[in-house]
């Protein structure tokens, strides 16, 4: 290995989980780091990023594969074979070996790299399967979807077994794996570069004197707790708490959500109607019509809107980690969160927020108490900013480098001798 390790991050998605880390390691001289992704991303982002590499999957990875029940395996094979060729070509072009590959488990599937390259391999796995992740029982998968989910589970168990190290974003995510595999899995949440903005000041938004209660997620899905938020708003309005209160739900209301099966349920429940989950829930909770839905926003506008919120509700149902929660905390948002899943790993009760059980009255009581206690909200906000600082990329990068060195050491100890590059 060279003094400065050659590290290649891999994902068909860019920007993605480790693109900021890749750039940070390179800019600070910690690694000769590169990001390998699809040609379209290289063409789009290449002028602003000098360390992008392209690879071409061995066939189409979007759309149906040859057999539904093995589609994820087939798609991963196409990605893996394309990666192998691209990595070998990169090593030949550079005249040196890659020391470490850090691959997204599905969008950089490393299953076809084992024993084919000299580099240590780290697999980044969000969660082992949708079965382990969980879904809202009101919107269940079809039997065929449940069976096809075994593809994902098999790929991830294989990676956890064969990779020099696997990384997951939370201890909760690691707990979803069989105990026999957990010792091969490290926990490390991503690094961020989020700059706090004083709440309610300098947001660039029109002044609104009302107390603002917010919900924020990439998509407005049941997994993120969107239904719970609307149900709580409905009850608050019914009980007279809606006066002088502004409610806002930030996120994409499109029917196709990331971690659930709501879209197909909506199509079957409302055939021929262009309805999304928001429309459905507003029929169930009509008093929640007071909620503002700004939709998916450009990042700068999203940041300003977050800064205008006095109290965030984060009633997560299912999930293993979330950028959205860190976006709130790092800016000093006051958070009421679920006391299960990964949330307690970021929110400490009565320190940088509050953790609540799955009981509506507990949430309503906490909302009223915090609304009446600006000093407590300010204390939570200050602690939340410190939480965000702990996950700033400058603080997280050394932890990642420790894990990377561990994986490379394991590779040196266990790999069979291989011929040097000519």
Which role fits each region the language model picked out?
Residues 316-317:
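Aromatic "clamp/platform" in nucleotide-sugar-dependent glycosyltransferases that forms part
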Residues 349-350, 354-360, 369-374:
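Conserved acidic donor-binding segment of nucleotide-sugar-dependent glycosyltransferases
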Residues 259-300:
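Nucleotide-activated donor-binding/catalytic signature segment of Leloir-type glycosyltransferases, i.e.
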Residues 204-224, 230-235, 247-248:
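Conserved donor-binding/catalytic core segment of Leloir-type glycosyltransferases
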Residues 1-48, 234-237, 412-422:
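N-terminal subdomain of nucleotide-sugar transferases
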Residues 60-69, 122-154, 257-268:
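Acceptor-binding helix/loop patch of EC 2.4 sugar-transfer enzymes
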Residues 145-201, 206-208, 212:
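Donor nucleotide-sugar binding/catalytic pocket of nucleotide-sugar-dependent glycosyltransferases
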Residues 334-337, 347:
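Short hydrophobic beta-strand element within catalytic cores of glycosyltransferases
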């Amino acid at each position: 290995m060279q003094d400065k390790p050659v590290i290649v991050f891999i994902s068909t998605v860019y920007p993605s989980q480790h693109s900021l880390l890749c750039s940070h390691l390179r800019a600070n001289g910690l690694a000769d780091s590169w990001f390998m992704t699809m040609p379209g991303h290289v063409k789009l982002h290449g002028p602003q990023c000098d360390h992008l590499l392209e690879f071409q999957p061995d066939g189409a990875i979007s759309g149906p594969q040859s057999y539904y029940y093995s589609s994820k395996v087939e798609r991963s094979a196409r990605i893996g074979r394309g990666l192998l060729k691209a990595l070998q070509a990169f090593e030949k072009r550079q005249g040196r070996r890659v020391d470490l590959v850090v691959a997204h488990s599905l969008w950089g599937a490393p299953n076809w790299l084992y024993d084919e390259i000299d580099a240590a391999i780290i697999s980044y796995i969000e969660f082992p399967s949708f079965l382990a992740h969980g879904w809202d029982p009101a919107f269940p998968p079809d039997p065929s979807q449940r069976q096809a989910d075994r593809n994902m589970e098999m790929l991830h168990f294989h990676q956890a077994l064969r990779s020099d190290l696997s990384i997951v974003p939370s201890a909760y995510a690691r707990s979803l794996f069989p105990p026999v595999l957990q010792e091969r899995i490290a926990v490390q949440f991503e690094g961020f570069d989020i700059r706090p903005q004083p709440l309610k000041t300098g947001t660039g938004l029109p002044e609104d004197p009302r107390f603002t209660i917010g919900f924020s997620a990439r998509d407005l899905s049941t997994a993120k707790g969107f239904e719970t938020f609307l149900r709580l708003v409905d009850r608050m309005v019914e009980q007279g708490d809606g006066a002088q209160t502004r409610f806002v739900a930030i996120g994409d209301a499109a029917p196709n959500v990331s971690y659930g099966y709501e879209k197909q349920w909506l199509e079957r429940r409302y055939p021929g109607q262009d309805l999304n989950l928001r429309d459905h829930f507003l029929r169930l909770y009509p008093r929640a019509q007071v909620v503002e839905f700004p939709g998916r926003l450009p990042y700068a506008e999203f940041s300003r809107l977050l800064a205008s919120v006095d109290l965030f509700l984060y009633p997560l149902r299912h999930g293993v980690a979330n950028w959205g929660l860190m976006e709130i905390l790092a800016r000093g948002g006051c958070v009421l969160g679920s006391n299960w899943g990964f949330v307690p790993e970021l929110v400490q009760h009565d320190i940088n927020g509050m953790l609540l059980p799955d009981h509506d009255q507990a949430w309503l009581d906490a909302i009223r108490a915090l609304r009446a206690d600006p000093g407590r909200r300010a204390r939570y906000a200050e602690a939340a900013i410190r939480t965000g600082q702990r996950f700033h990329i400058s603080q997280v990068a050394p932890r990642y480098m420790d894990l990377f060195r561990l994986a490379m050491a394991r590779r040196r100890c266990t790999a069979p001798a291989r011929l040097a590059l000519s």
